[in-house]
UniProtKB/Swiss-Prot annotation:
Residues 66-70 are annotated as: G2. It is found in: Cytoplasm. Residues 16-211 form the tr-type G domain. Signal peptide: none annotated. One of its GO terms (cellular component) is cytosol. GO terms for molecular function: GTP binding; GTPase activity; translation elongation factor activity. It comes from Mesomycoplasma hyopneumoniae (strain J / ATCC 25934 / NCTC 10110). Gene3D superfamilies: P-loop containing nucleotide triphosphate hydrolases, Translation factors. InterPro entries: EF-Tu_GTP-bd, EF-Tu_GTPase, EFTu-like_2, EFTU_2, G_TR_CS, P-loop_NTPase, Small_GTP-bd, T_Tr_GTP-bd_dom. Residues 181-183 are annotated as: G5. This is Elongation factor Tu. Its EC number is 3.6.5.3. Residues 142-145 are annotated as: G4. The gene is tuf.
Length: 402
């Protein structure tokens, strides 16, 4: 992630479009090996710094409101784009990461071992991708080198993957599926290196350029916070909209009734200096006069007076069906789940519209939510509803009450 350390650094190169991407898929299907292979193959072309499996697997821990998430952020380029790539070693880390928005992906690479085919976590990650709004994914069918002469079996696995993607409303018929061997590519075998380059060509062409909200007021969700001795407090996260320049005044909003004003005195991405952070950037910002205790994950840094924290609002929600990973039973008016906004989760209570007694899985309903802590939300803010470690609903704020 972006870390602001010293000023004697190179400037970040903005000549290529910046895209956020990540590897998803079942445990041991080769996500981290593929991440290492992509960086290694592109490094040979001068487009990345090679990262080995161990450095990605020993990912730093990120604290998400008391939840530990291991994530590895690496960067690489193709001829067309600059990519920030997130990989999570643990399955639980993926779930938390995708839900809290730590890995806000413009697209995903789904890794499926051809030796196994789609497995339970393959299905779960596809479902989660749909829930959190990942628009498209490209498939890497891995471990092909272990299936020489088994062409028919590989064809069947490919059909199964396409059907699975279509069942979750992805375009299974047209999703690129690249057959390869991440380990073979990592070991420098030319036929498998070529497949990694083919994969990145597919990512370049199939994953659409996201529409960034540049003209809206600056807002960045705080993902992580740390102190740099002698310089101050740094917050990292993804810029959701707008842009901010060095020495601009901003506010830290959420959890408290009053926002805290501060000035941005440094901006970095991947250890390179920026003059401006803009929508889509995974940036680190140095904040003047802010103590470590004044800011935490789940708050937002925003242009002054553009967003305020709220506890009560009306929302339109969809309760996931049992088959979609939701509840098996209805919920009633004393239900108190967690509501996930951007990088934070807050417990809240619900009130139904008059005449409604319960919500059945599969229902689309309007209801009122009251959170136990004020959060920076506004009309149109999206959230998910979680309980006991699973997503049970998704919603949008329709009207602020207080």
């Amino acid at each position: 992630m972006a870390v602001v350390k010293t000023t004697g650094k190179k400037d970040f190169d903005r000549s290529k479009e910046h895209i956020n991407i990540g590897t998803i898929g079942h445990v041991d299907h080769g996500k981290t090996t593929l991440t290492a292979a992509i960086s290694t193959v592109l490094a040979k072309r001068g487009l990345a710094e090679a990262k080995d499996y161990a450095s990605i697997d020993a990912a730093p821990e990120e604290k998400a409101r008391g939840i530990t998430i291991n994530t590895a952020h690496i960067e690489y380029s193709t001829d067309k784009r600059h990519y920030a790539h997130v990989d999570c070693p643990g399955h639980a880390d993926y779930i938390k990461n995708m839900i809290t928005g730590a890995a806000q992906m413009d697209g995903a690479i789904l890794v499926v071992a051809a030796t196994d085919g789609p497995m339970p976590q393959t299905r779960e990650h596809i479902l989660l991708s749909k829930q959190v709004g990942v628009p498209k994914m490209v498939v890497f069918l891995n471990k092909i080198d272990l299936l020489e002469g088994e062409e028919e079996m590989v064809d069947l696995v490919e059909v199964e993957i396409r059907e699975l993607l279509s069942s979750y409303d992805f375009d299974g018929d047209n999703t690129p599926i690249i057959r390869g061997s991440a380990r073979g590519a990592l070991e420098g075998k030319p036929e498998w290196e070529a497949k990694v380059l083919e994969l990145m060509d597919a990512v370049d062409s199939y994953i659409d350029s996201p529409v960034r909200e540049m003209d809206k007021p600056f807002l960045m969700a705080v993902e992580d916070v740390f102190t740099i001795t002698g310089r101050g407090t740094v917050a990292t996260g993804k810029v959701e909209r707008g842009q901010v320049k060095l020495n601009e005044e901003v506010e830290i909003v959420g959890y408290r009734e009053e926002p805290k004003k501060t000035v941005i005195t440094g901006i970095e991405m991947f250890n390179k200096n920026l003059q401006t952070a803009m929508a889509g950037d995974n940036a680190g910002v140095l904040l003047r006069g802010v103590d470590r205790k004044d800011i935490e994950r789940g708050q937002v840094i925003a242009k002054p007076k553009t967003i305020i924290p709220h506890t009560k609002f009306k929302a339109a929600i969809y309760a996931l069906k049992k088959e979609e990973g939701g509840r098996h039973t209805p919920f009633f008016k004393n239900y108190k789940p967690q509501f996930y906004f951007r990088t934070t989760d807050v417990t809240g209570g619900i009130e139904f519209e008059p005449g409604r007694e319960m919500v059945i899985p599969g229902d689309n309903v309007d209801l009122t939510v009251e959170l136990i802590a004020p959060i920076a939300v506004e009309q149109g803010t999206k959230f998910s509803i979680r309980e006991g470690g699973r997503t049970v609903g998704a919603g949008t704020v329709t009207e602020i009450i207080k």
